[in-house]
C-alpha cells in the first residue's frame, strides 16, 4: 500500500508551475476518437487518469505516443468494441467515451463509470440528451448499450434540467458529427468546455457559444488532425494558492489564468490573503491575520466545488467562525473527520461544514477519501506540527501532476512511500 509521509511545520517558498487541466484532458482524449488523422495535445498533466485513458485508447486500437507533456494519438485504428469494465469503472470521466463513440460509430457498449464517491452524479442528463438525438439505451449486467440502430445520430434541441459540465461536453462531442443542428440550452460555462470546443473546432467542427449557456453545433462529416495546447488547471492553481497562503513565506504560482479563478481569488481577498496578480502568475506573500468567511459553491463562474476542500485547511487558520456550503456534491464533507483527527475545530451540521479558527493542527494518520479531500489533507499535513501519514493516495495521484516533486522543490518534507 502506498502512502504519503509529511513532516510538517516548515514554511514553503519558491516557484511552482501549474500543469495542464485534468478536467479538460479527460474529455479531450476521448474526443480525439472523432478525428480522421493524428491529433497532438501539449501540456498534458502526468496523472494516473491520463494513464488510464491512454490504456483504454490503446485497447480500442489507437496508436499513442506520450513523451514529457506531449501526447500524440492516431485514432484511425480505433474499433467499435465493448469498453473494458475494470478500466472504465475506475475512472469517472470514462463517460466521455459515450459521446465520441456515438459520434463515430453510432453505438457504444461501456461499463458504468467509477471515480470519486461524492454522492449522486447521475448520468441521466447525458442519456436524456443522447435519446433526443436518436440513441436507444439499454443495460446488460454491468454494461450499458447505446445504439442508433444503424441510423446516423441526429441533431436536437436539448435543455439541460440542471447545469452539468459532463453532460454539456458529452452532448457537444456527440453532436459534432451528427446530422443537422444541435442546440444545448442551460449549458455549463466552465473553461474546460471552451477548451474541448476549441479542440473540436480546430479539427473542423462548427461549434458556437461554448462558455455561454447556449451552445450551437452544426454537424460535420469529417474532422481532421490538429495540435492543441491544454489550458492550465485552475483547480491545481487554486490548490497551490491556498497552500501558499496557509504555509508559505513567498510562493509564486506560474502558468495561471486569473480569469478562471476570479471568484476563488475574491474570497481569498475577503479573508485578507495578500497576493499580487501578474500576467500569467500569482505571487502569494507570507500571511498575517486572516478573517473567517462563508463559502458557498456554485456552477462556474461561481466558487468551484473542486476548491472548497483544498481551501478548508487555510480557513482553519482564520480568526472566527465560518461555514462551507457545497451545493454541487452533497458528500464533499469526507475530509472533515480526517481534519478532526489532526485537531481541527470543524464539524458537519445539517449538511454544512462549520469551522472555528484558528485551529492548531498536529500530525496524524489520515485517509484520502477522494481527490480533493486528499489535497486538503496534504495541505493540512504541511501546516501541522509533527508527522502526518496519508493513505489511499491513489485519489491524489489521479489529479495532481508531480505533486511530490513540486512540493519538495518548495521546501516541503514529503515522501511517497511504497509499502
From Swiss-Prot:
Catalytic residues in the record: 116 (proton donor)
Q: Which residues carry this modification: 2-(S-cysteinyl)pyruvic acid O-phosphothioketal?
A: 116
User: Which keywords does UniProt give here?
Assistant: Cell cycle, Cell division, Cell shape, Cell wall biogenesis/degradation, Cytoplasm, Peptidoglycan synthesis, Pyruvate, Transferase
What reaction is this protein's catalytic activity? Answer: phosphoenolpyruvate + UDP-N-acetyl-alpha-D-glucosamine = UDP-N-acetyl-3-O-(1-carboxyvinyl)-alpha-D-glucosamine + phosphate
EC number(s)?
2.5.1.7
Where, by residue number, does UDP-N-acetyl-alpha-D-glucosamine bind? 92, 121-125, 306, 328
Per the UniProt entry, what are the Gene Ontology biological process annotations, in alphabetical order? cell division; cell wall organization; peptidoglycan biosynthetic process; regulation of cell shape; UDP-N-acetylgalactosamine biosynthetic process
Q: Which cysteines are joined by disulfide bonds?
A: none
SUPFAM superfamilies per record: EPT/RTPC-like
The record's family statement is:
Belongs to the EPSP synthase family. MurA subfamily.
Query: What's the protein name?
Result: UDP-N-acetylglucosamine 1-carboxyvinyltransferase 2
